[in-house]
Amino acid sequence: MATPSNKNSKSHKRNRRGHIGLNVPNIVLDQTTGEYRVSHRVSPSGVYNGKQVIDKK
């Protein structure tokens, strides 16, 4: 069974975990509808790249 030979300090542990974190989604203002949406996704109204791609029922 592997056991640690030396104690890792708090700074060493935090340096190792520095890449772990939350990613902020890239939210943009849609030019055609004026709604906020995540980039490279269809807007809630069904518009993508200035074209209606999904018909709302």
UniProtKB/Swiss-Prot annotation:
Keyword list, A-Z: Ribonucleoprotein, Ribosomal protein
GO cellular component terms listed in the entry, alphabetical order: large ribosomal subunit
Recorded superkingdom: Bacteria
Ranges where the record places region Disordered: 1-25
Organism: Leuconostoc mesenteroides subsp. mesenteroides (strain ATCC 8293 / DSM 20343 / BCRC 11652 / CCM 1803 / JCM 6124 / NCDO 523 / NBRC 100496 / NCIMB 8023 / NCTC 12954 / NRRL B-1118 / 37Y)
Protein name: Large ribosomal subunit protein bL32
BP GO terms, sorted: translation
Family: Belongs to the bacterial ribosomal protein bL32 family.
Molecular functions per Gene Ontology: structural constituent of ribosome
One Pfam family it belongs to: Ribosomal_L32p
Biased composition (Basic residues): 9-19
Signal peptide positions on this chain: none
